């Protein structure tokens, strides 16, 4: 039985983006498909949703399909300002083509600001509808770096994701 015959597969993803230098009210950061108000925006080629990028990488990794950068390179103008939801759905299609579906996933968002936890219920609702996965199959949490490093200085945001698929 080859690797693709295994009943379960696991992938891990990571992404990081820096914040814009300008600070003004009315900006937002896309996180798990939700616009979270912040005084800075995101520097990115696509919409810059670090959590969806990490999930996409985890799902692609789970299937042995490389990385988000291989499928949607930031050097390709067609992905300029592209929706991260599209990337994740394309990765899910690749999994389905190999007869796999998402069993569960865990996302950790790393930043000092903005505060993430108040938005988690909406994030879960969004991901549940997008991926057709029950909210009981997902976990989203946020941590800080205790003011250490570039994330601790408030220069950006990162996300880690672990995802498990099962053979359907």
Curated annotation (Swiss-Prot):
Annotated site, Transition state stabilizer, chain positions: 45, 144
Pathway in which this enzyme or protein is active: Isoprenoid biosynthesis; isopentenyl diphosphate biosynthesis via DXP pathway; isopentenyl diphosphate from 1-deoxy-D-xylulose 5-phosphate: step 4/6
Binding site for 4-CDP-2-C-methyl-D-erythritol 2-phosphate: 15-17, 45-46, 72-76, 150, 153
GO molecular function, one term: 2-C-methyl-D-erythritol 2,4-cyclodiphosphate synthase activity
Keyword match Lyase: yes
Source taxon at top rank: Bacteria
EC number: 4.6.1.12
Cofactor note: Binds 1 divalent metal cation per subunit.
Names of the cofactor(s): a divalent metal cation
Record-listed a divalent metal cation binding positions: 15, 17, 53
GO biological process, any: isopentenyl diphosphate biosynthetic process, methylerythritol 4-phosphate pathway
Catalysed reactions, semicolon-separated: 4-CDP-2-C-methyl-D-erythritol 2-phosphate = 2-C-methyl-D-erythritol 2,4-cyclic diphosphate + CMP
Metal-binding found in the keyword field: yes
UniProt keyword list: Isoprene biosynthesis, Lyase, Metal-binding
Pfam family, one: YgbB
Family membership: Belongs to the IspF family.
Function: Involved in the biosynthesis of isopentenyl diphosphate (IPP) and dimethylallyl diphosphate (DMAPP), two major building blocks of isoprenoid compounds. Catalyzes the conversion of 4-diphosphocytidyl-2-C-methyl-D-erythritol 2-phosphate (CDP-ME2P) to 2-C-methyl-D-erythritol 2,4-cyclodiphosphate (ME-CPP) with a corresponding release of cytidine 5-monophosphate (CMP).
Assembly: Homotrimer.
PANTHER family according to UniProt: 2-C-METHYL-D-ERYTHRITOL 2,4-CYCLODIPHOSPHATE SYNTHASE, CHLOROPLASTIC (PTHR43181:SF1)
Protein name: 2-C-methyl-D-erythritol 2,4-cyclodiphosphate synthase
Native source species: Anaplasma phagocytophilum (strain HZ)
Gene name as annotated: ispF
